[in-house]
Amino acid sequence: MSTETNNNLCIGCNKPFKSTDNIKTSNFKKYHEQCFSQDLNCSKCSGPIIASAEHKQVLGKIYHSKCFTCASCSKVLSDNDFSEISGIPCCKSCFTEIKFNPNFAISKFGSASAITQNDEKTKEKFEMKTNLYNNLQKGKDICTWCRNQIQADPDNEAVSFGGNIYHSNCFTCSKCSSSIGKNQFVTGSDGSAICKSCSDKSKQVNCFACKKPIDSTFTVVSGNKYHPNCFVCSQCKGSLEKGYIEKDGPVCGKCAATFTQPQTRTFAYSNGKGARPNGRW
């Protein structure tokens, strides 16, 4: 069955023309003079805009007054109380939330996969919010760690590392989690950033006895390193300058004489370049 347009009805108000009416024509459509508005359509609902209906022209587009709403929360907007992101209208409240909370558009609706294909209205809303966020962030750097926008801030400058960008206070040591910021650091074997303090500790040699760093000469015994003053008899804590034997640790000759089994006497003093040749008791 085919339908024909009634040429005696105004497209704007759907009322019949009178013989006394001035008729306007556009795109083969007829309007009462008071209903004619250059055959414009609403940018949101695509419905015709007629002169007798409330409408407004903003951001280079024309809307029914009731259709000029925030793309984020659907609040009806007034002429002087709205913001825009890349030509998309939104209320000032949503604009602020989107601008200063980069995860707002996504966190409010969840991931795209969580939106059912049947719920087209919800899906459309989600896409609109995501587009608002993406348009706002175009050309702006996002911190790899906190996912917030990196603003021009002399107290929190950006740091680039490994192809990523961070707020300086978000750029931290992979070992101790302290902030590296703009300070010196080294790159670990796994490609992570390590602060200078942790790097120095990893290279540091500690005394086996006192656990403190060794920064000069040392003695090597059974693969362990000692400060010269820390290498003492494990029994009496006396000097081992004349040699030692291994008995649950280095033992001096006097203490060794108390043992029933003969032991091997060993000399192993070093200036840090290696042990001396071993001798026999």
Swiss-Prot record:
Designated name of the protein: LIM domain-containing protein G
Recorded name of the encoding gene: limG
Coiled-coil ranges from the UniProt annotation: none
PANTHER family, per the entry: FOUR AND A HALF LIM DOMAINS PROTEIN (PTHR24205), GH01042P-RELATED (PTHR24205:SF16)
Domain of life: Eukaryota
Domain LIM zinc-binding as annotated: residue spans: 40-101, 141-205, 206-262
GO molecular function: metal ion binding; transcription coregulator activity
Keyword terms of this UniProt record: LIM domain, Metal-binding, Repeat, Zinc
Gene Ontology CC annotations of this record: nucleus
UniProt-listed SMART domains: LIM (SM00132)
